[in-house]
C-alpha cells in the first residue's frame, strides 16, 4: 500500500507524512530529501557553493557517491546529513537541480526501488509523487497552503535565520519553477484528495486525512 502526498514547498508534506506514518504504522519517505542530498553533493564539489554545475557533471558525481535508505532516512555515504540539507543555500539551488531530467529519473528510480523490494506500507511525499512517480497509488493527497502561511512555517523551522520577506520570495520563485518544469511539474492529478492546510494544525490535518482514507477503504470493499 502506498499513500502519496504531493504539493508545494512548505505546505506541510513532511511533517504530516511523518505523523501519518506513526499513526498508521507506515514507513515514511521524502523525495525532497533525496533531491536535497543531490544538491549537497553538487555544492561539495564546488569551491563556491553558490555556483552551479552541469547535469552531466552532477550525474557523474552521483555515481561516485552512495545514497542508501534506512529507517525512513536517506543516507549519503552512510551518513545522515539531514542537518546539512535543510538550509537556505540548499533551498536556493534544489529547484534548479531537480529540473534536470536525468536527476529526476535517478530519484524516481531510487524511490521505486525502495518500494519494489519491500513488503512494507509507505507514505511517500514530494512534488510529482502523485503524477509521475506513483500515479497508481491507492490514496493520493495534495496539500496546499498560502505563500504567507508557508513562509511563516519555514521561518519558525529555521529559527528566524531568514526574514519572512526573504522566505516568501524564495517560495514564490520555487513555486514558479516547479509549475513550469518540462518534466515533473507541480500540478493536481486525477483522483487526488485536495486539502488546504493554511489554517489547520498538524493534528487536525492528520485526522481529516485518516478519516478520508478509512472512508475510501470502506467504499472499496
UniProtKB/Swiss-Prot annotation:
InterPro entries with a match to the protein in the record: Cytidylate_kin, Cytidylate_kinase_dom, P-loop_NTPase
GO molecular function annotation: ATP binding; CMP kinase activity; dCMP kinase activity
Annotated EC: 2.7.4.25
Enzymatic class: transferase
GO CC annotation, single: cytoplasm
Intracellular or extracellular location(s): Cytoplasm
Organism superkingdom: Bacteria
Keywords carried by this UniProt record: ATP-binding, Cytoplasm, Kinase, Nucleotide-binding, Transferase
Main location, first listed in the record: cytoplasm
Reactions the enzyme catalyzes: CMP + ATP = CDP + ADP; dCMP + ATP = dCDP + ADP
Biological-process GO terms, alphabetical: pyrimidine nucleotide metabolic process
UniProt similarity note: Belongs to the cytidylate kinase family. Type 1 subfamily.
Name by which UniProt lists this protein: Cytidylate kinase
Native source organism of the sequence: Borreliella burgdorferi (strain ZS7)
Amino acid at each position: 500500500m502506498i499513500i502519496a502526498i504531493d504539493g508545494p514547498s512548505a505546505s506541510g508534506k513532511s511533517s504530516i507524512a511523518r505523523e501519518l506514518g506513526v499513526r498508521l504504522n507506515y514507513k515514511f519517505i521524502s523525495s525532497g530529501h533525496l533531491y536535497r542530498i543531490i544538491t549537497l553533493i553538487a555544492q561539495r564539489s564546488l569551491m563556491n557553493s553558490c555556483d552551479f554545475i552541469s547535469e552531466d557533471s552532477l550525474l557523474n558525481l552521483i555515481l561516485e557517491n552512495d545514497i542508501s535508505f534506512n529507517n525512513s532516512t536517506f543516507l549519503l555515504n552512510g551518513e545522515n546529513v539531514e542537518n546539512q540539507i535543510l538550509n537556505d543555500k540548499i533551498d536556493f539551488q534544489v529547484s534548479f537541480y531537480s529540473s534536470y531530467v536525468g536527476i529526476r529519473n535517478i530519484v524516481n528510480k531510487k524511490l521505486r526501488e525502495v518500494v519494489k523490494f519491500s513488503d512494507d506500507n509507505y507514505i511517500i511525499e514530494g512534488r510529482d509523487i502523485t503524477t509521475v512517480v506513483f500515479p497508481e497509488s491507492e490514496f493520493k493527497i495534495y496539500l496546499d497552503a498560502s505563500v504567507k502561511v508557508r513562509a511563516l512555517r519555514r521561518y519558525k523551522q529555521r529559527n528566524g535565520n531568514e526574514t519572512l520577506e526573504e522566505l516568501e520570495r524564495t517560495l514564490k520563485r520555487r513555486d514558479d519553477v516547479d509549475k513550469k518544469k518540462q518534466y515533473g511539474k507541480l500540478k493536481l492529478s486525477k483522483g487526488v484528495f485536495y486539502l488546504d492546510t493554511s489554517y489547520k494544525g498538524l493534528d487536525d490535518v492528520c485526522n481529516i486525512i485518516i478519516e478520508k482514507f478509512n472512508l475510501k477503504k470502506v467504499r472499496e470493499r
